[in-house]
Amino acid sequence: MTAPLLEISGLGKRFGGFVALDGINLAVAEGERVGLIGPNGSGKSTLVNCICGTLVNESGTVRFNGESLAGLKAHERTHRGLARSFQLPRPFTSLTVAGNLRVPMVYTVNARPGTHLSAADIDARCAELLRLVGLDNKATHLPRDLTQVEMRKLELARALAAEPKLLIADEAMAGLSQAEVNDIVGLLINFNERGITIILIEHIMRAVMSFSQRLVVLVSGKKIADGTPDVVIQDPEVERAYLGQ
């Protein structure tokens, strides 16, 4: 049996007396599309921060691609193939759109053993990524010139520029119109079809349902459901805790 790409066992995190994560177990297979949902304060962001190395868990383990991530800093985890996009995009404001994509290629991809992208390679990959997300006509623009949905696309493209095995997309659609949400969902599915495993954190249920092959639900730091979307949304505990029914 193939080992999971991401394997979390007994993960626990406290902030003083507050239990943010309580014994979380989660396995994500290579190529999966997983939706991570739950009410505000349920532990989603804390879990992602522990996976990515922004926070240190007090108990349990995180393994990625067969390797323990214990003791690795966030940038070291990125070098191993973990990438994250943020709800509030964080581009380099003084760099062009294309320049923002070059940074992870130079400092992340080229930092991996045995990898060296030439300037021509980087230019070609930038152009390909910009076409993929529909920003090829914005390559020389600064981030301040972009619309809200274009900023979200740039944020996703920056994450992809690091050539991850796993992308964690955090609230990539908040505040967008329905048409823009559909556009982002289509992009994420396209990324997945190109071989990237994706965990999507999102409150827009129609987006989560159309994207996810599997749903994981957190409430009060505990995993209360994990399964296919059609089964999870009918779980009485999920309805009470998350959907308010």
Question: Language-model segments: which ranges?
Answer:
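Glycine-rich phosphate-binding loops of nucleotide-dependent enzymes
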Residues: 2-245
